[in-house]
Amino acid sequence: VYIASPYKVLAVRESQRKAQAISIAQQECLKIMRECEGFTPVSPILQFSYLDENKHRDKALQMGLELLKACDYIYLSKHKDAKYSQGMQEELALAKKLGIKELVLELPL
């Protein structure tokens, strides 16, 4: 399961963005691990966290899309800033184009 979660759109200080994005991605991966037995969550934010956002953003986005192509499902983060994420919308559009199903969890509030 490809985990699409927000990064650039996060409403935090620039100095806190990477740490916040990693934390959100970790939470979403743990959610899939707990709720979807037999599914393996993968996150481009976690996978490529060693890259410098300022120097390698385009390469990270490209590698993330390659990672998506290898997945059977895409899961969209429910973080409050996610609905404004252009990157997540692009990931979802590619997933739909490739026939990758969106995984939707119906969790109680």
Question: What is the predicted role of each segment?
Answer:
Residues V1-L109:
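Catalytic phosphate/metal-binding cores of nucleic-acid and nucleotide-processing enzymes, i.e., regions
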